[in-house]
Regions:
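Short amphipathic alpha-helix that is part of the acyltransferase structural core
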Residues: 1-53, 58, 74-76, 80, ...
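Oxyanion-binding "anion nests"
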Residues: 206-232
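Residue-level signal for alpha-helix termini/capping positions
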Residues: 42, 104, 219-222, 280
Length: 341
């Protein structure tokens, strides 16, 4: 057996699709899969995908997004890893490890958030540094949504009996955080907007959001769901952006607050509150959010969100590990925002 490592452009598209269908466990038509992969890999901007091939067959993959981060006040490119997977019958040959070691030799520091049990077992053994864990927040608005989330959490899938659970509202009224000023305003972000985004609050580690990322989300294929992009203003000043995703599932609508980009800490609670109310007005029966920022976590808790098991985060190399705090790590990281179901 001879395993070759090739780039995305040098591999068979049909073989990649077959491998990723097994990785994601999704049941999509060929047309939908082609559209999704063109957006996911072709339109995202900087990134690199390594594929392990046994002859013409794709047997392993490791993908990465490359985007700017603010690290202790300096802007630096960071490589976010995702889609680390190889066919079970090839794991004994170290195919996945070989892909990761190849990626670890690149010049950018690397970030990994969450992942499979296999991933979380291997990264510490590869001497990655563990960052502070990321809180996992959940707010179930209806009884059916709560049943769906529990069955998915415990069994890995949403069971058919969930649809028989009545759509009883568990939360009748949610508090609304007052705006920071009388002239505060929330607007929908238009895909035609090309203005440069303001710098974010001074975190020790946070992604540097730009218009290209917002454009990428705004042009996502319909099968991914719908991304809600909101802009926040105070006295005409652009003070933040929120990115959320709405998915229509069999049991109802699930939403996820993917990321908040705020220019200062004091507007975060208002932005979280307005984003949540927007998602509820759009029909969300449950809202999820990952957050490591203490201000964001406090705002979510005050609105009734419940903390679930935290999500591990890792950094390579140890010698460049960010220190201090706070960190602002959310679902705006590689493919974490694009989980299905």
């Amino acid at each position: 057996m001879s395993i070759n490592v090739v780039s995305l452009n040098d591999s068979d598209p049909a073989g990649i699709r077959e491998l990723l269908v097994r990785r994601w466990k999704c049941d999509w038509s060929e047309e939908h899969l082609v559209d999704y992969l063109a957006w996911r890999y072709g339109a995202r901007g900087s990134g690199e995908t390594l594929l392990a091939c046994d002859g013409p067959r794709c047997v392993g993959i490791l993908d990465s997004f490359i985007r700017p981060y603010w690290i202790a006040g300096r802007r630096e490119m960071v490589r976010e890893t995702c889609d680390w997977f190889c066919l079970p019958e090839y794991r004994a040959f170290g195919v996945g490890l070989h892909l990761m070691r190849r990626m670890m030799a690149r010049q950018e520091p690397m970030l990994s958030i969450g992942g499979t049990e296999f991933t979380l077992d291997l990264l510490p053994r590869l001497k990655w540094a563990q960052l502070p864990r990321i809180d996992n927040f959940v707010l179930a608005i209806s009884l059916r949504a709560a049943a769906a989330l529990i069955s998915t959490r415990l069994l890995g899938q949403c069971l058919a009996p969930v649809h028989a659970v009545p759509e009883v509202r568990l939360i009748r009224k949610l508090a609304r955080q007052p705006p920071p000023s009388a002239d505060a305003e929330v607007r929908a972000y238009a895909p035609s907007d090309q203005e440069e985004l303001p710098n974010g609050a001074p975190y020790a580690l946070a992604p540097s959001l730009d218009a290209a990322v917002l454009q990428w989300f705004a042009h996502a294929p319909a099968l991914v769901g719908e991304f809600a992009l909101l802009s926040f203003f105070c006295a005409g000043e652009h003070v933040g952006i929120s990115i959320s995703r709405l998915e229509k599932l069999r049991w109802g609508c699930k939403a996820r607050i993917i990321h908040l980009h705020a220019t200062r800490f004091e507007v975060i609670a208002w932005m979280v509150s307005e984003t949540l109310h927007h998602l509820l007005e759009r029909g969300a029966g449950a809202v999820l959010c990952h957050a490591s920022c203490p201000k964001m976590g406090s705002a979510l808790s005050e609105l009734g969100f419940v903390r679930g098991p935290p999500i591990p985060a890792y950094w390579w190399p140890r010698s460049k590990q960010p220190t201090g705090g706070p960190f602002h790590l959310t679902s705006l990281q590689a493919d974490n925002a694009l989980l299905f179901g």
